[in-house]
């Protein structure tokens, strides 16, 4: 019977406790002149994630999106959204937890951030902006590879010193 209880405690669990907007900003530095020009924007998306441990098995993950639209040389708008979530995560290995915080949680948060960006852009009276889905699993794998490469280079540099 105790064995069954231990197995239940070890089973991975993932619960979303809260999803919220942590920070939001929309700027149109060249309005109203930007509305008088032909609309041929160049849109750039920057994103970042970070996480911090709030308590045992409870983590905050923050997905930051910055969307910059330039019309020619002028900035048409700058939109920044920090979408956050509080997640209770138990029963994972360190590697699985890192993947959850770096890829799975941002996947949960992205639709909320995308909607916030779209709403802000519309309220700024710009044409609708539909952000494409982001493959956070691939971005996390790339991040892990970069860290491993940097770790492999560090001992080599120390040996040469």
UniProtKB/Swiss-Prot annotation:
SUPFAM superfamilies given for it?
A: SecB-like
What highest taxon heads this organism's lineage? Answer: Bacteria
| GO term, biological process aspect, one | protein transport
Q: Where are the transmembrane segments?
A: none
Q: List, in alphabetical order, the Gene Ontology terms for molecular function in this entry.
A: unfolded protein binding
What the entry lists under Pfam families is as follows:
SecB (PF02556)
Q: Which GO terms describe its cellular component?
A: cytoplasm
Is GTP-binding among the key words of this record? no
InterPro entries the record matches: SecB, SecB-like_sf
Q: What UniProt keywords apply to this chain's record, in alphabetical order? A: Chaperone, Cytoplasm, Protein transport, Translocation, Transport
**Could you tell me where this protein is found in the cell?**
Cytoplasm
User: What is said about its interaction partners and assembly?
Assistant: Homotetramer, a dimer of dimers. One homotetramer interacts with 1 SecA dimer.
State what this protein does.
Answer: One of the proteins required for the normal export of preproteins out of the cell cytoplasm. It is a molecular chaperone that binds to a subset of precursor proteins, maintaining them in a translocation-competent state. It also specifically binds to its receptor SecA.
Family assignment? Belongs to the SecB family.
Q: Could you identify this protein by its name?
A: Protein-export protein SecB
Q: Which organism is it from?
A: Shewanella piezotolerans (strain WP3 / JCM 13877)
Provide the gene name from the record. secB
């Amino acid at each position: 019977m105790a064995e069954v209880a231990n197995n239940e405690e070890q089973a991975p669990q993932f619960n979303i406790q809260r999803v919220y907007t942590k920070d939001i900003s929309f700027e149109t530095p060249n309005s109203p002149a930007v509305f008088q020009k032909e609309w041929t924007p160049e849109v750039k998306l920057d994103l970042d994630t970070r996480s911090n441990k709030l308590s045992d098995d409870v983590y905050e993950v923050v997905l930051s999106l910055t969307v910059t639209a330039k019309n020619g040389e002028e900035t048409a708008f700058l939109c920044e959204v920090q979408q956050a979530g509080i997640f209770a995560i138990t029963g994972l290995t360190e590697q699985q937890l890192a993947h959850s915080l770096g890829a799975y949680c941002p996947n949960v948060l992205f639709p909320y951030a995308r909607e916030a960006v779209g709403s802000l852009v519309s309220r700024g009276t710009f044409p609708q902006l539909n952000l494409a889905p982001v493959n956070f699993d691939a971005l996390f794998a790339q991040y892990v590879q970069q860290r491993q490469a940097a770790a492999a280079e560090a001992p080599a540099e120390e040996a040469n010193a």
